[in-house]
Design a protein with these regions (language model features):
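Conserved RecA-like helicase motor-core motifs
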Residues: 71-83, 176-182, 212, 230-239
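Pre-Walker A adenine-sensing motif
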Residues: 2-23, 41
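Inter-Walker segment of RecA-like/P-loop motor cores
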Residues: 69-109, 238
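Conserved strand-helix element at the start of the C-terminal RecA-like helicase core
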Residues: 49-62, 162-166, 203-235
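Interdomain hinge/linker at the junction between the two RecA-like core domains of SF2 helicases
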Residues: 161-207
């Protein structure tokens, strides 16, 4: 089944005298469309908890910023706070290249007050290890990440796939965690058809009133767009 609004509540102890005594780190492997992000913002909203969400893609960060704020988990987006120190009450969505910004001012003194969310955890670790954009600041990013993860109140990692490499990062940092594997498949039972001919796909698309065609390269998207040759069709690429 999907994770549910209160799924993450089990990873903290019941309140005593109005305070939660213990938070548990958790890594959740769950299929796309099973409510991982939804569970997180309900968890944050219900307790009015401060959080830092780390992402590898700016587009994911922008999407999170929009969804979180629309659903009552108020936060800032790192690109919107350039030029000023972060305050201790600021929840933040930040692309990992800019994680060093967390050390500005006194913000780092309050890491223990924050829940850290690592969405698309597997992709985040892969990006951290291999991205050429981190070539000149990888050590600084690793240092800041370790500091954040070892000092924060709780770590929540989610992805549809979790590799041993991703878990090894937590092990290297000396972080204990619970691993949860959700076996529910969001698209189970949905029929799909494999087509090996681009021309066949294009001909089928032309018959549809509305469609969404996803490609794994900008070049392929442009080829299909040009072949369809319909001014009402919109092409969206990295440019």
């Amino acid at each position: 089944q999907k994770l549910g609004y209160d799924f993450l509540e089990q990873f903290k102890s019941p309140e005593e005298f109005g305070l939660v005594q213990q938070y548990k780190n958790v890594v959740v492997k769950s299929d796309t469309g099973t409510g991982k992000t939804t569970s997180f913002y309900h968890y944050i909203k219900n307790d009015n908890t401060k959080f830092i969400s780390l992402v590898s893609r700016i587009s994911l960060g922008q999407e999170q910023y929009k969804i979180f704020n629309e659903n009552g988990a108020e936060c800032l987006f790192y690109q919107n706070v350039e030029g000023r120190d972060l305050q201790q009450d600021d929840s933040l969505v930040v692309q990992i290249d800019s994680i060093a910004k967390l050390n500005k001012g006194l913000y780092y003194d309050f890491y223990e007050d924050f829940v850290v969310y690592l969405d698309e955890f597997n992709s985040l670790v892969e990006y951290l290890i291999t991205s050429p954009t981190l070539e000149n600041k990888r050590i600084e990013v690793f240092y800041t990440l370790k500091k954040l993860l070892t000092m924060c109140k709780q770590i929540i990692c989610t992805d549809a796939d979790i590799s041993d490499t991703s878990l090894e990062l937590l092990k290297i940092f000396g972080i204990d965690y619970s691993f949860i594997k959700n076996k529910y498949k969001h698209n189970k039972g949905v029929k799909c058809t494999e087509v090996n001919s681009r021309d066949h796909i294009i001909n089928k698309i032309k018959l549809e009133e509305k469609f969404l065609c996803c490609c794994d390269s900008k070049t392929e998207a442009e080829i299909i767009y040009n072949e369809i040759n319909d001014p009402s069709v919109k092409l969206i690429t990295s440019e």
